């Protein structure tokens, strides 16, 4: 199926230490970027959350403390991730209530200006199925 895009869109998913966007941390972010010319770019960043990953969270996504202990923290990747999604619409499952708020919190903690996210358009596929 060919999408008729007016601007690039990034489908993204986070794996995290929990479900609280204000306090929990990202341990992995995966992004599929679709350009208007159908070009696709996939990126995955494994991230050290700098705190223990609860067993409950690891049982869901399979990422353990051992797997991230030697990975850089979010701040290390923050500019690269921001540049990758800058100017794109964003899409995913539950992005409006969880993924995007948590991502914005991580950017704020990394001193990234998040004012551009005020204007970002999102497609939250969770709303399609509710």
Q: What name fits each language-model region?
A:
Residues 1-119:
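Conserved non-catalytic scaffold segment of RNase H-like nuclease domains
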Residues 120-130:
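Short alpha-helix plus adjacent loop in nuclease-associated cores
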């Amino acid at each position: 199926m060919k999408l008729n895009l007016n601007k690039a869109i990034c489908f993204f998913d986070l794996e995290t230490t929990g479900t609280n966007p204000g306090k929990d941390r990202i341990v992995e972010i995966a992004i599929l970027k679709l350009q208007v010319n159908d070009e696709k770019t996939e990126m995955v960043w494994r991230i050290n959350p700098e705190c223990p990953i609860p067993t409950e969270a690891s049982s869901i996504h399979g990422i353990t403390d051992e797997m991230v202990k030697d990975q850089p923290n979010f701040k290390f990747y923050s500019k690269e991730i921001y540049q990758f999604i800058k100017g794109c619409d964003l899409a995913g499952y539950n992005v409006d209530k969880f993924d995007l708020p948590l991502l914005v919190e991580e950017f704020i903690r990394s001193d990234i200006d998040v004012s551009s996210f005020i204007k970002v358009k999102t497609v939250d596929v969770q709303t399609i199925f509710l």
